[in-house]
């Protein structure tokens, strides 16, 4: 399944204005918003947070990488081009955990 099709299968983020992503020790890493260039990542990170209780574990990160579909391969070929995918790659490879907190509209 490609990225666009996968996004249609995941929970809606219409009720969100943002999603804060932090390290396990609470250090702010990024804020995803429903705007061009971030909307797909907002959907994926939100869905992972819902499935895994607000924690993106290495297993959750690997699932998220599958959901990014063709963009995952592009991120591997061009490190730094897709920072939200790079973050999941780092989580999956390092064993670290990310925390996500949704901000409702």
What are the functions of these language-model segments?
Residues 1-4, 64:
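N-terminal secretory/membrane-targeting helices
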Residues 3, 28, 32, 43-47, ...:
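N-terminal, charged low-complexity regulatory/assembly segments
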Residues 3-27:
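Short, charge-rich, low-complexity alpha-helical interaction segments
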Residues 9, 37, 41, 57, ...:
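Intrinsic-disorder-associated interaction segments
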Residues 10-16, 54, 94-98:
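Surface-exposed polar/charged interaction patches
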Residues 20-56:
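Amphipathic alpha-helical interaction modules
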Residues 55-63:
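Short, charged, surface-exposed loops that flank catalytic or proteolytic processing sites
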Residues 62-105:
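Short, compact, well-ordered microdomains
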């Amino acid at each position: 399944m490609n990225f666009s099709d996968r996004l249609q299968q995941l929970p809606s983020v219409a009720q969100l204005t943002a999603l804060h992503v932090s390290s396990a020790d609470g250090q702010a890493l990024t804020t995803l918003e429903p705007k061009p260039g971030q909307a797909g990542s907002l959907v994926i990170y939100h869905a992972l947070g819902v499935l895994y209780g607000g924690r993106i574990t290495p297993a959750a990160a690997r699932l998220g990488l599958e959901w990014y579909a063709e963009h995952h391969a592009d991120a591997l070929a061009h490190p730094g081009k897709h920072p939200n995918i790079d973050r999941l790659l780092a989580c999956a490879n390092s064993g670290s955990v990310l925390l996500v907190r949704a901000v409702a509209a």
